[in-house]
Amino acid sequence: MESSSPALSVAIAVLAALLGLTGFGVYTAFGPPSKRLDDPFDDHED
């Protein structure tokens, strides 16, 4: 089996990191941790 190029390995690692961060952000925004998020506009009602 021929070894893959280093550029392909780096590209896959960067893609996996971006997908992981995106998934974590969506989970934080819409999942159970979103109950602890504050809305700054609600804190400063006029």
Swiss-Prot record:
Pfam families recorded? PsbN (PF02468)
Topology relative to the lipid bilayer, per the entry, is:
Single-pass membrane protein
Q: Which GO terms describe its cellular component?
A: plasma membrane-derived thylakoid membrane
Q: Which InterPro entries match?
A: PSII_PsbN
From the Swiss-Prot or TrEMBL record, state where the protein is found. Answer: Cellular thylakoid membrane
Entry keyword set: Membrane, Thylakoid, Transmembrane, Transmembrane helix
Q: Please indicate which superkingdom the organism of origin belongs to.
A: Bacteria
Sequence intervals crossing the membrane: 10-30
Question: Has keyword Membrane?
Answer: yes
Q: Main location per UniProt? A: membrane
Looking at the keywords, is tRNA-binding present? no
Q: Which GO terms describe its biological process?
A: photosynthesis
What HAMAP family does the record tag this protein with?
A: PSII_PsbN
Stated role: May play a role in photosystem I and II biogenesis.
| Entries under NCBIfam families matching the protein | PRK13183.1
Q: Which family does it belong to?
A: Belongs to the PsbN family.
Protein name, UniProt field: Protein PsbN
- Record gene name: psbN
